[in-house]
């Protein structure tokens, strides 16, 4: 986009989920006994809203969300990355208003829009197991976009999970199953050249800590 939009209106990529990625990076460094300021991570925040963050030497260097939380991964109800030309098609061919487009992309797309069932992965997984093809499509698209984003973020980290095995990441199936329902765990196999960790986030803790630090300075 023209640089003028940044200069005059502050149009830029902001990114979101910063407190979550900050917390997860710090806790993962502790788990692996690594100094966070010398460590590189790719953090994936996966909830109804989803984002991936490339963390180099303990600091964010790239994130999948942009000016708004709409950019990036397929999410619960958000579409993630799309062709910007879609906006012209929706307005000229289907007479959509700007508000209708915003509602479509933010509230009616993603896992909900693809599966036409739910924005909740648990419901979609149950339907996929039962043979629902749209539920399976939604899960496949979600996982594909996530794996592609993780692979892309090896570039800013100057390096490169089952789909990423060629990158040196091998999973321990049992450890992967154990690291569910809020449990932290190292899920990479012993022979994996890179480590993969499941780390539950705690955004509230980071916000509370920041608030406490700010009030100390008042």
Residue ranges and their predicted role:
Residues 2-10, 128-134, 191:
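Gly-rich Lys/Arg/Thr-decorated short loops/hinges at beta-loop-alpha junctions or inter-strand turns
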Residues 46-48, 157-162:
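Glycine-rich beta-strand-to-loop/alpha-helix junction loops that act as flexible
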Residues 1-93:
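Glycine-rich phosphate-binding loop of actin/hexokinase-like ATP-binding domains
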Residues 91-117, 121-124:
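Oxyanion-binding "anion nests"
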Residues 110-114, 121-156:
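Adenine-nucleotide phosphate-binding core of ATP-dependent small-molecule kinases
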